[in-house]
Amino acid sequence: MARNKIALIGSGMIGGTLAHLAGLKELGDIVLFDIADGIPQGKGLDIAQSSPVEGFDANLTGASDYSAIEGADVCIVTAGVARKPGMSRDDLLGINLKVMEQVGAGIKKYAPNAFVICITNPLDAMVWALQKFSGLPANKVVGMAGVLDSSRFRLFLAKEFNVSVEDVTAFVLGGHGDSMVPLARYSTVAGIPLTDLVTMGWLTAERLEEIIQRTRDGGAEIVGLLKTGSAYYAPAASAIAMAESYLKDKKRVLPCAAHLDGQYGVKDMYVGVPTVIGAGGIERIIEIDLNKAEKEAFDKSVASVAGLCEACITIAPSLK
């Protein structure tokens, strides 16, 4: 039986972590790609040399030519510039848009049947541009955002309540930025909604709002601490969960930046919503009822993403 092929486009901190995790999970053969010749080859060799110790069999190679990704089943895109302290995700737009154009052309030529997961920031605008540049079906191109944001929310809640992270589910909608919308009403501890836990006295509404704000600032908090880079362990783990659901047809319900075509009243944009990921890619977008305050917050987030997409069109009119 032919093994799956996973192409990791970008061999920085997230790319290297992705390669290691994909190897440990034996998801298939792995290609680390980067235009900086030597880095993907070196990281690929280093990770491959860990396989006898870790006990996984995976052909792991590094490459600096797009032809190496030919026939990939999954492409995970991390190429681009990472945030530095004081930068917003949006500050990266002009630089990383040019990168997405090159990546899109490479995927279009060599891996047109792949399921593509974009991690590059500003996420919602970059995945939108990548889909346009690559010409791949919208259900096969998705952004990694909600899995990470929800994971951060879950961790902070688990620490607050002193319970296992496994018993906390969390729901984050909207753009992957300061306007993201963590939904307390749809987030639970052992099935009990957070709003009920406030009523039960487990925490105050004010404390819950502090946790929600920390979730919004989750990436910036790490950037501020690292000073020379941004998060990579949790983003990589989040993308691997998405890739695994696709490769194994698990049909997991995962919040992702997905292409909306009328859902939630949004047209031709990528925004974070709950999805079902299976062998068909994004097989379903789940529309939930939002109350007035939630809808206003979601619409504000959508407007922020729309502004980024307009900025992309100004730089690259072909995206229109």
UniProtKB/Swiss-Prot annotation:
Binding positions (NAD(+)): 10-15, 34, 96, 119-121
Do the record's keywords include NAD?
A: yes
Positions annotated to bind substrate: 83, 89, 121, 152
Task: Tell me the domain of life.
Answer: Bacteria
UniProtKB keywords? NAD, Oxidoreductase, Tricarboxylic acid cycle
HAMAP family found in the cross-reference section: Malate_dehydrog_3
- Protein known as: Malate dehydrogenase
Source species: Rhizobium rhizogenes (strain K84 / ATCC BAA-868)
What gene, per UniProt, encodes this protein? Answer: mdh
